[in-house]
């Protein structure tokens, strides 16, 4: 930028006397020219005389120039012309001030909108501003100059009166870019402090142009002029560093969301319960807005944004929830675990208690037997007295033999095998103690003459088969005798009928049509006029023999409608453990005890293992039942679980009970179970209160006999085919056991 000089030539206005007093206003300073600014001019309150301002340090503007400054520059010789220059300076400063205010308002609004962004500061071109700031017309006359001075003084006074109201403590940063001919101006920083000058003594605006600030004391210019103070010119020069730019405070980061669980992890916006940005989830369980996760997966990212598990658009599930809150269930889970632990300990204690009761019962019976033997021996000794040594030795041998026989183990020995059917298809059997007759279901031996199925009668006295009795047209699935001495046989078959057959006449005396295949049947021990039929759909029909038309009641299953594989009646008993009477219904999914009271039935679901149940048999005297399970996921072998039936009074009532059961002993068999077999639980032939359990094992084609007290395997009765049914018998004070296969019956005797 070209450097311009400001020269004031007033040779005609000053005389030789005044010209000798004027000092040079331009002094060379290196390669720069220093321009001394005059002090501010003020008016006195008492008179209209013009006064120069007090002697104060002022700024000195150093103008760079590519050319060397002249050695001597003509200084202004008239103080009025110096006053004119100062007034011109103030006028231009006021104009600059108004433009600065407009720029400041614009900058302030822009800064509010772009708060937090980076600021770029730039200064105006100092040299261009200064060249226009200090230009004075050299050909200007004195009279017009004085008139213009008065006009500018008024303007200056009005502008200075407005300065305090417009002053601000903020620092305004102006950015301008000026282009000159063939060269570009440097960008400097300009700070304009509007509140620097007090209202009483207005001073020109302070310009900081990143250059040298000069302070000096002015010498007297003229003693003849009527001014109260002398005009001082700056003589002392000192340097000042650049004032640093006032930086804006950094933008504070926005506070995080108070509840980050309500925002989408992709766009960080709250999800909604309706619309496009509604709450959605992936298979991994992470939550997003629907549109966000849809765009995410469409963009080629086939993974969850949070866990990087594989995901696709079909995995997006819209959740219909107003809000999500994690429920603290730690206390609930802790209580559940403690409850399960308590229940397991209770079951263990019940099992130990039941085993102890069985052992006490066995030991009590054994003790009673020993006492009876001791009494018999004492009687023998009293009758024969102290005989010879031979008699004594024989007595000792008798005692030892009695003790050994009482403590020795008895077992079943094979007695006879009886062929029932050449073609097979035998299924179930039952024993009538009053007639000493064992009946076995079989297909008709003469299918052309007598089609269908019936029973074959076996005499338990001579172990011979007598004759075949036809009953049903399809396979027989259940046989049961009444406790009355009438010889009535109840049979259930797949031909949708339940029939009563008299063994005295070998004829069917009553037929009931059930409408569905019948899988099992039993008699009511408390009232022999009622019989039960278990259907394929899980229902149990109750028939009254005095009503020959229809069933009197239907017991509808509470759960799944699985076939009734077993029916057993539990008679009432004067027992504290289980005094209730009713029918025990066993299905493929579990068991239910229907308590009978005043010809009304109340169901009690027993807590058995879900699924896999093939048979349930009852031992009515000890209130134990045997539940057979086929192999499953948890066990790969056939299990027989002996359960003890229990009951608790409800609300201190004398007649209302809650019936249940718990396991006492478990017996393990082979790993094969393809047929629905029937097992047996009965009292030991020793009459000592011991309960024996006998179950068929398809893997070894045998019947396994266990002791229920300690769970030990007592005996293994071998067979040629899988054992389908087991029936204990009492014949002439002898205990026998019959096992049935598809073709024959094997008889074992307890010895």
Swiss-Prot record:
<comment type="function">
    <text>E3 ubiquitin-protein ligase required for the repair of DNA interstrand cross-links (ICL) in response to DNA damage. Plays a key role in RPA-mediated DNA damage signaling and repair. Required to translesion DNA synthesis across DNA-protein cross-link adducts by catalyzing ubiquitination of proteins on single-stranded DNA (ssDNA). Mediates ubiquitination of the hmces DNA-protein cross-link, possibly promoting its degradation.</text>
</comment>
<dbReference type="InterPro" id="IPR001841">
    <property type="entry name" value="Znf_RING"/>
</dbReference>
<dbReference type="Pfam" id="PF13639">
    <property type="entry name" value="zf-RING_2"/>
</dbReference>
<dbReference type="InterPro" id="IPR037381">
    <property type="entry name" value="RFWD3"/>
</dbReference>
<keyword id="KW-0862">Zinc</keyword>
<dbReference type="InterPro" id="IPR015943">
    <property type="entry name" value="WD40/YVTN_repeat-like_dom_sf"/>
</dbReference>
<dbReference type="GO" id="GO:0036297">
    <property type="term" value="P:interstrand cross-link repair"/>
</dbReference>
<dbReference type="InterPro" id="IPR036322">
    <property type="entry name" value="WD40_repeat_dom_sf"/>
</dbReference>
<dbReference type="Pfam" id="PF23419">
    <property type="entry name" value="WD40_RFWD3"/>
</dbReference>
<protein>
    <recommendedName>
        <fullName>E3 ubiquitin-protein ligase rfwd3.L</fullName>
        <ecNumber>2.3.2.27</ecNumber>
    </recommendedName>
</protein>
<feature type="compositionally biased region" description="Basic residues">
    <location>
        <begin position="99"/>
        <end position="114"/>
    </location>
</feature>
<keyword id="KW-0963">Cytoplasm</keyword>
<feature type="repeat" description="WD 3">
    <location>
        <begin position="559"/>
        <end position="604"/>
    </location>
</feature>
<feature type="compositionally biased region" description="Acidic residues">
    <location>
        <begin position="167"/>
        <end position="188"/>
    </location>
</feature>
<dbReference type="GO" id="GO:0016567">
    <property type="term" value="P:protein ubiquitination"/>
</dbReference>
<feature type="region of interest" description="Disordered">
    <location>
        <begin position="97"/>
        <end position="188"/>
    </location>
</feature>
<feature type="compositionally biased region" description="Polar residues">
    <location>
        <begin position="121"/>
        <end position="142"/>
    </location>
</feature>
<dbReference type="InterPro" id="IPR001680">
    <property type="entry name" value="WD40_rpt"/>
</dbReference>
<keyword id="KW-0853">WD repeat</keyword>
<dbReference type="GO" id="GO:0061630">
    <property type="term" value="F:ubiquitin protein ligase activity"/>
</dbReference>
<keyword id="KW-0539">Nucleus</keyword>
<keyword id="KW-0227">DNA damage</keyword>
<keyword id="KW-0833">Ubl conjugation pathway</keyword>
<feature type="zinc finger region" description="RING-type; degenerate">
    <location>
        <begin position="264"/>
        <end position="308"/>
    </location>
</feature>
<keyword id="KW-0677">Repeat</keyword>
<dbReference type="InterPro" id="IPR056527">
    <property type="entry name" value="WD40_RFWD3"/>
</dbReference>
<keyword id="KW-0479">Metal-binding</keyword>
<feature type="compositionally biased region" description="Polar residues">
    <location>
        <begin position="20"/>
        <end position="30"/>
    </location>
</feature>
<dbReference type="GO" id="GO:0016605">
    <property type="term" value="C:PML body"/>
</dbReference>
<keyword id="KW-0863">Zinc-finger</keyword>
<dbReference type="GO" id="GO:0005737">
    <property type="term" value="C:cytoplasm"/>
</dbReference>
<dbReference type="GO" id="GO:0008270">
    <property type="term" value="F:zinc ion binding"/>
</dbReference>
<feature type="region of interest" description="Disordered">
    <location>
        <begin position="1"/>
        <end position="33"/>
    </location>
</feature>
<dbReference type="InterPro" id="IPR013083">
    <property type="entry name" value="Znf_RING/FYVE/PHD"/>
</dbReference>
<feature type="repeat" description="WD 2">
    <location>
        <begin position="513"/>
        <end position="553"/>
    </location>
</feature>
<feature type="repeat" description="WD 1">
    <location>
        <begin position="471"/>
        <end position="511"/>
    </location>
</feature>
<comment type="pathway">
    <text>Protein modification; protein ubiquitination.</text>
</comment>
<keyword id="KW-0234">DNA repair</keyword>
<keyword id="KW-0808">Transferase</keyword>
């Amino acid at each position: 930028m070209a450097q311009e000089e400001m020269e004031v030539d007033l040779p005609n206005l000053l005389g030789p006397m005044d010209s000798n007093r004027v000092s040079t206003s331009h002094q060379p300073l290196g390669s720069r020219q220093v321009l001394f600014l005059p002090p501010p001019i003020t008016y006195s309150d008492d008179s209209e005389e013009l006064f120069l301002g007090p002697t104060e340090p002022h700024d000195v503007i150093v103008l760079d120039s590519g050319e060397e400054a002249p050695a001597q520059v003509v200084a202004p010789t008239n103080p009025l012309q110096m006053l004119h220059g100062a007034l011109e300076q103030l006028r231009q400063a006021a104009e600059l001030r108004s433009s600065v205010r407009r720029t400041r308002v614009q900058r302030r609004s822009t800064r509010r909108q772009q708060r937090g962004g980076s600021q770029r500061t730039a200064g105006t071109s100092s040299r261009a501003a200064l060249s226009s700031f200090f230009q004075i017309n050299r050909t200007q006359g004195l009279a017009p100059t004085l008139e213009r001075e008065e006009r500018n003084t008024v303007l200056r006074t009005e502008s200075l009166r407005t300065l305090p109201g417009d002053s601000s403590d903020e620092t305004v940063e102006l950015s301008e870019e000026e282009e000159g001919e063939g060269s570009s101006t440097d960008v400097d920083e300009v700070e304009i402090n509007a509140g620097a000058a007090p209202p009483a003594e207005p001073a020109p605006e302070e310009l900081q142009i990143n250059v040298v600030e000069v302070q000096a004391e002015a010498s007297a210019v003229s003693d003849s002029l009527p001014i109260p103070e002398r005009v001082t010119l700056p003589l002392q020069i000192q340097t000042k560093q650049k004032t640093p730019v006032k930086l804006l405070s950094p933008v504070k980061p926005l506070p995080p969301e108070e509840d980050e669980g309500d925002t989408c992890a992709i766009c960080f916006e709250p999800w909604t319960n309706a619309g496009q940005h509604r709450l959605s989830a992936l298979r991994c369980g992470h939550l997003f807005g629907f549109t966000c996760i849809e765009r995410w997966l469409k963009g080629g990212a086939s993974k969850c944004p949070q866990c990087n598990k594989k995901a696709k658009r079909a995995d997006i599930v819209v959740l219909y929830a107003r809000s999500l809150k994690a429920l603290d269930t730690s206390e609930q889970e802790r209580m559940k675990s403690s409850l399960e632990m308590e229940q397991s300990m209770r079951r263990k204690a019940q099992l130990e208690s039941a085993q102890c009761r069985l052992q006490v019962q066995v030991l009590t019976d054994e003790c009673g037997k020993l006492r009876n033997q001791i009494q018999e021996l004492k009687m023998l000794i009293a009758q024969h007295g102290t005989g010879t040594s031979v008699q004594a030795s024989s007595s000792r041998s008798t005692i030892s033999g009695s003790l050994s026989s009482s403590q020795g183990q008895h077992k079943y020995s094979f007695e006879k095998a009886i062929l029932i059917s050449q073609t097979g298809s035998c299924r179930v059997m039952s024993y009538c103690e009053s007639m000493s007759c064992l009946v076995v279901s079989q297909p008709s031996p003469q299918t052309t003459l007598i089609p269908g199925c019936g029973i074959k009668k076996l005499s338990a006295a001579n172990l011979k088969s007598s004759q075949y009795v036809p009953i049903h047209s399809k396979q027989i699935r259940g046989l049961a005798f009444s406790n009355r001495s009438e010889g009535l046989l109840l049979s259930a078959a797949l031909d949708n009928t339940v029939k009563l057959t008299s063994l005295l006449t070998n004829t069917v005396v009553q037929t009931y049509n059930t409408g569905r295949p019948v899988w099992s049947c039993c008699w009511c021990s408390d009232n022999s006029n009622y019989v039960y039929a278990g259907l394929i759909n899980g229902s149990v029909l109750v028939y009254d023999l005095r009503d020959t038309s229809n069933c009197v009641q239907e017991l509808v299953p509470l759960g799944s409608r699985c076939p009734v594989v077993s029916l057993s009646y539990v008679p009432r008993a004067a027992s504290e453990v289980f005094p209730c009477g009713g029918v025990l219904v066993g299905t493929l999914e579990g068991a239910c005890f229907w308590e009978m009271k005043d010809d009304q039935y109340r169901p009690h679901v027993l807590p058995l293992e879900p699924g896999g149940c093939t048979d349930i048999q009852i031992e009515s005297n000890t209130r134990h039942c045997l539940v057979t399970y086929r192999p499953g996921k948890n066990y790969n072998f056939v299990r027989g679980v002996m359960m003890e039936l229990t009951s608790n009074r409800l609300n201190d009532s004398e007649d209302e009970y809650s019936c249940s059961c718990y396991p006492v002993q478990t017996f393990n068999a082979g790993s094969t179970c393809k047929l629905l077999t029937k097992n047996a639980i009965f009292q030991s032939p020793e009459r000592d209160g011991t309960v024996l359990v006998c179950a068929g094992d398809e893997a070894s084609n045998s019947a396994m006999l266990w002791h229920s007290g300690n769970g030990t395997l007592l005996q293994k009765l071998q067979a040629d085919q899988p054992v389908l049914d087991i029936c204990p018998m009492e014949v002439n004070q002898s205990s026998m056991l019959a096992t049935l296969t598809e073709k024959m019956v094997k008889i074992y005797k307890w010895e």
